[in-house]
């Protein structure tokens, strides 16, 4: 990557980020990509991105289903991850390690995340902000649904201030 653009700096981290360490890394980033497989991590990353107004490119895959979205609170109408999946809601935690995931699906979702991140960094095209892109890996069909901001959201709504 440095050969293509010497101004790009990629810093790989081989550690679990929590608390202050997570906050510091999110604050220093231009774009955050979340590829985690559990809600508590996704919510922690979302809170840090919301706090520091950093765009979050979220991707997930389980069994034969995948999803990608961008949560960019620099845009006033953009929802955050918590607007879509409220923390503390009785959402069934289904982990890849237990349920499995169709291996090519992770590559497809990851590629879509990379494309969204590059568009955000380059400032080109239309991001997935405000939309959730869903992939049915068995039918090999993509569909997009509109996402709305939750006015009662405890992370990005008026109650969060």
Briefly describe each language-model feature range.
Residues 1-161:
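Adenine nucleotide-associated cytosolic modules
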